[in-house]
Amino acid sequence: MKPVANSQSSINNAVQHAGSSSSVLDLSGEWIGYYRGHYDQVVRITQSGDEVVAVKVTGDDHVPAGEVTFRASLKTLSGEGQVAEKEFRNPCFVPGKLAIMSRERISFSWENCGTVEFRKDD
């Protein structure tokens, strides 16, 4: 996944220089992501100030619908993503990183667990 340089640069600048990035970059809404080994899944992102939380609308054998899949800070792009064994056993959060390619494309990388790219679902 290759970021679009101009979009990435302007979005990063807006996030870094805004007092509240929520007025500059709003990621709220439904996003579609392909979780490797599963299928396309829909997540709903809510945003409060500089914090975003993604909750699964459609789930899988590991993290079901209604559960948080990741949360992150727009200021640092650091966050944590939820992982679990099949049937949602032993769920836990691991460190992760949010990446913003454009207003319509983001990704989240779970430490040692892979990356999911999301596209805005209009």
Please provide the spans of the model-predicted regions.
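Soluble ligand-binding/transfer domains with enclosed cavities or grooves
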Residues: 1-122
